[in-house]
């Protein structure tokens, strides 16, 4: 609904998602109210960055004033706090788009991520680009006055929203005269927020959250008036923050708190980073990199098409957000800044696609991040190893993508992988391939693994029986991406990675001659049974053979060496893709009573053969085409085994 006023003001209703968000701000995040100033200052900084970038091609946008700054002020009598900037500003359409709606693409994800924990929810605000609305945590009315650089003074815009009375959920937009470009946001404070009407308080918040902002944040200087016995505001400006590019300073001059504060700005995050690396690269290509590993995964981490992470500067001039070409897709969670001395100031995303300089920077950044992760993973310090464990829980599945995407760094990435295994017998992925190699049995020349849909399915797989008997460790792979990872990682440190559920099982020196002869003898002894079972099962199996991989189970299904495994086939089917046609091999345990009975079974042979196959299929995590027939067969066999009890 839209209402026109005689004075030219237009009243509009908020998008439903914005109403929901405003309710959240007001009622759920009040204990994290300080974030409002951080978010508004961060937005003002972005507006200044955007103006400087657009002015590279259109210097007239500066309108004779290229000294970009952010100003924070307050009025004790009016009970207002004001944040203003002389950045790019907004047109009327931009005001309605940016302040009246939230991008549909992020709305559902934002609300699905909310936990009810105020601290956790607060960090989502900046991450989802809805920081402006945090103003309503402390204000019941917000007034925005803005004009886009390059537009006439008469094309200024006033936006206003009061979250009280009947007007709650509505906002007004009207045309006004505004001589200076940029944006001014005035917060009319709620009752109980009067402590913000203090220069000391506001300066403290700026230094706490926004000290790293590149533009100067100005406030009117305050002096002590002896006669009035209070602080009074002067007409002189003072810069509250350090107002320099943090990444250009020497590492020795930057405190840990400054690094963390800058991350919260550049990463739009409320939490502290897990780790960071800061370096200046000199030589043929000169650039500075300040790269952070977040402590938690972003909401859109699985969207490989979303632009992520790295801000690109050229000679300290902001060029673009989310310069995706600076980091490979499998490191899309990395946040930070790259400042190049070699790229042209008018660089575009199209130029980045073709730039060899960018390829060099990308390679350098990738190695730096992988090196940082490696140093955490292999550190002698328990705290660092704990950080890597946290990293792996949050980002491990994404890092795995690099095995198949980054051939140059494949070995380094493989060394960073972590898996569950039969050694620990817990679902925690804490075992590295190097750990596995260090525990290998004497004479073992392969790394064994099994893939399954869940940890319990993997650890209880019948394929592990012989390995448990011999004390051989097996990696338990249950992540959907693991099948793809293993397909791109045939070996590690000269040792082949081998599935325990594919092909003929060759334990090499781990299998003694007596066992081999016993298996060969059983194959001859059960030859007639194997042929009979193959005939009974028909097209359901490629082959039936005797196995030595089972100790407790009667049978298991095995994929042929070059066929798609059953777990991968299920994953492909779930993704709507057709797996290459293949039939499993049924392996039977000649020592199991059920198999021994089958050798002499005549009347219900087909039922026994079908049940053994179906049980093996279920043990693999498969599904039955005809569960009712399976149950019927089981019932018939149980009744037959019970004889004619109760008829005497």
Swiss-Prot record:
**Annotated region (A), positions in chain:** 1-349
Tell whether Nucleotide-binding is among the UniProt keywords: yes
Q: Which domain of life is it from?
A: Bacteria
One MF term in GO for this entry? Answer: ATP-dependent protein folding chaperone
Pfam families assigned: HATPase_c_3, HSP90
The record's subcellular location field reads: Cytoplasm
Annotated region C: where?
571-648
Q: Which UniProt keywords apply?
A: ATP-binding, Chaperone, Cytoplasm, Nucleotide-binding, Stress response
Please name the Gene3D superfamilies in this protein's record: 3.30.230.80, 3.40.50.11260, Heat shock protein 90, C-terminal domain (1.20.120.790), Histidine kinase-like ATPase, C-terminal domain (3.30.565.10)
The record's annotation in InterPro entries points to:
HATPase_C_sf, Heat_shock_protein_90_CS, HSP90_C, Hsp90_fam, Hsp90_N, Ribosomal_Su5_D2-typ_SF
Chain residue ranges for the region called B? 350-570
GO cellular component terms listed in the entry, alphabetical order:
cytoplasm
> What quaternary structure, including any partners, is listed in this protein's UniProt entry?
Homodimer.
What functional role does this protein have? Molecular chaperone. Has ATPase activity.
Checking HAMAP family in the record gives:
HSP90
Q: What protein family does this chain belong to?
A: Belongs to the heat shock protein 90 family.
Q: What is this protein called in UniProt? A: Chaperone protein HtpG
State the organism named in the record.
Aromatoleum aromaticum (strain DSM 19018 / LMG 30748 / EbN1)
């Amino acid at each position: 609904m839209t209402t026109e006023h005689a004075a030219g003001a237009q009243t509009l209703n908020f998008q439903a998602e914005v109403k929901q968000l405003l309710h959240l701000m007001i009622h759920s995040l009040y204990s994290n109210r300080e974030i409002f100033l951080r978010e508004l200052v961060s937005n003002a900084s972005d507006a200044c960055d955007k103006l400087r970038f657009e002015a590279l091609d259109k210097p007239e946008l500066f309108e004779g004033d290229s000294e970009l700054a952010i100003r924070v002020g307050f009025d004790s009598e009016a009970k207002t706090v004001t944040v203003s900037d002389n950045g790019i500003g907004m047109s009327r359409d931009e005001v309605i788009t940016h302040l009246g709606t939230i991008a549909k693409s992020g709305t559902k994800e934002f609300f699905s991520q909310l936990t009810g924990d105020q601290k956790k929810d607060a960090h989502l605000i900046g991450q989802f680009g809805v920081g402006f609305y945090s103003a309503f945590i402390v204000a019941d009315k917000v007034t925005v006055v803005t004009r886009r650089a390059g537009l006439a003074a008469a094309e200024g815009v006033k936006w206003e929203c009061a979250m009280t009375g009947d007007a709650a959920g509505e906002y007004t937009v009207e045309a006004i005269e505004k001589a200076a470009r940029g944006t001014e946001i005035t917060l009319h404070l709620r009752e109980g927020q009067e402590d913000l009407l203090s220069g000391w308080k506001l300066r403290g918040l700026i230094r706490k959250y926004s000290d790293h902002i590149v533009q100067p944040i100005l406030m009117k200087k305050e002096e002590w008036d002896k006669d009035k016995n209070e602080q009074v505001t002067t007409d002189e400006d003072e810069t509250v923050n350090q107002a320099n590019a943090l990444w250009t300073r020497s590492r020795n001059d930057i405190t840990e708190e400054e690094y963390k504060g800058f991350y919260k700005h550049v990463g739009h995050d409320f939490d502290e980073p897990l780790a960071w690396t800061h370096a200046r690269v000199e030589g043929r290509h000169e650039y500075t990199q300040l790269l952070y590993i977040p402590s938690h995964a972003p909401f859109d981490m699985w969207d490989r098409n979303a632009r992520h992470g790295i801000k690109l500067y050229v000679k300290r001039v902001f060029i673009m957000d989310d310069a995706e070409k600076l980091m490979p897709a499998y490191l899309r969670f990395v946040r930070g800044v790259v400042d190049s001395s070699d790229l042209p100031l008018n660089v575009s995303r199209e130029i980045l696609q073709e730039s060899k300089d960018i390829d060099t920077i990308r390679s350098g950044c990738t190695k730096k991040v992988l090196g940082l992760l490696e140093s955490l993973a292999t550190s002698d310090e328990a705290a660092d190893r704990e950080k890597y464990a946290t990293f792996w829980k949050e980002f491990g599945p994404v890092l795995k993508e690099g095995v198949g995407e980054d051939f140059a760094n494949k070995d380094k990435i493989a060394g960073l992988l972590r898996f569950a295994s039969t050694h620990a017998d817990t679902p925690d992925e804490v075992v590295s391939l190097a750990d596995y190699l260090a525990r290998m049995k004497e004479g073992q020349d392969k790394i064994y693994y099994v893939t399954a849909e869940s940890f319990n399915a993997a650890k209880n797989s019948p394929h592990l029986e012989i390995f448990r008997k011999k004390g051989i460790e097996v990696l338990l792979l249950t992540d959907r991406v693991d099948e793809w990872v293993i397909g791109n990682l045939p070996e590690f440190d000269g040792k082949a990675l081998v599935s325990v559920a594919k092909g003929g099982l060759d334990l090499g020196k781990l299998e003694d001659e007596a066992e081999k002869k016993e298996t060969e003898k059983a194959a001859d002894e059960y030859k007639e049974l194997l042929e009979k079972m193959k005939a009974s099962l028909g097209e359901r199996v490629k082959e039936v053979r005797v196995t030595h991989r089972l100790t407790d189970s009667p049978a298991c299904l095995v994929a042929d060496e070059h066929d798609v495994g059953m777990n991968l086939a299920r994953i492909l089917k779930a993704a709507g893709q057709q797996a290459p046609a293949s039939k499993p091999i049924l392996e039977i345990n000649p020592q199991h009573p059920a198999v021994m009975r089958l050798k002499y079974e005549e009347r219900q042979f087909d039922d026994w053969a079908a049940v053994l196959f179906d049980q093996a299929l279920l043990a693999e995590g498969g599904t039955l085409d005809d569960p009712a027939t399976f149950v019927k067969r089981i019932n018939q066999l149980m009744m037959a085994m019970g004889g004619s009890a109760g008829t005497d």
